[in-house]
Amino acid sequence: MKLFVLGATGYIGGDALHAIVKVHPEYDITALVRNPDKGAQVAVDYPKVKLVYGDLDSCELIVEESQKADIVCNWADADHEAAAKAIIKGLSARQSGTPGYLIHTSGTGILMYTDLDQKIFGEDATKIHDDWDNIQEMITGIPDHAPHRNVDKVVQSVRDGKAVKSAIVCPPCIYGAGRGPGNQTSVQVPLLAQNTLKQGHGIQVGAGKTFWTQIHVHDLSNLYLKLVEAAAADGGSATWNDEGYYFCESGDLVWGEVAHQVAKSAHKQGFMREDQVKEYSPEEVKKLAAWGPALWGCNSRCRAIRAKKLLGWSASSPSLKDEIDATVLFQAKKMGLVPGHAKIAAGDA
């Protein structure tokens, strides 16, 4: 079974690669990496993985490698339209007589469009999207201007399934330490922790009532593994193309509550004098983090039904709340707030 993977040194892709290689060392895997330094990171942990050098704009290379593959996993960028088109072009040109499989990564930021359109930040929402009863809403009902939607539509444009069968995995707020060869850190909660430590207090957008959904990176990787295994079994029990949309979640979070958890953890670990949380306007948050108003202030709620029903997938890793202390400590170390750590990290100790 030949796989071509994009994003192997990223947070999502690195952990997914770890999960797949651990269970299926027999797979013939080729990874796109940007440069020899990135390649060396992969080669140390996965010497059997073949490396090709380029980036997401290396469309001819992506077409060529996709044409050679049975399965392509795009873990690299939910917003790179040219790369998605190149993958589909390559898979469509395969001469094997069987369909090639594309497993693409989107993100539940796509669900923020209502709040973004109405410029509502910090308030709650009752709308919960799902990938079973309302699957067609995710295929045809999301407006074109929603985040990630342009590339979702490219992937969904392959409808007959004769040459290409596609599945979109749509993860929410991802947390937990990755196991990959490159980046092992997520964005939303670590960025909140970093700015909390910088400001000396917790950061809440507006009333702090905003809902998101959460998933541990290890549980997300398990879904990628199950989809790859299904693809390797001629599609298996998975659904593809018009029904190939998979949320991946383990429940809701409320950003105001997360802000308090981060502040309490920072105080408990001695990085802040108190555990106070301050309310910020979207404009104030934007000065700290360009996407902060959306990441911590817009609603994005979903339910992962399809993977559970069809693939037997379930989440089993620790909750986000259980990982807060480790996240805060990691960011504190990066910022040199842990005595001696900055010198060790710089090689001066």
Predicted regions and their residues:
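Glycine/proline-rich active-site loop of Rossmann-fold NAD(P)-dependent oxidoreductases
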Residues: 176-190, 227-245
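Conserved beta-loop-beta element that borders a ligand/cofactor-binding pocket
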Residues: 152-180
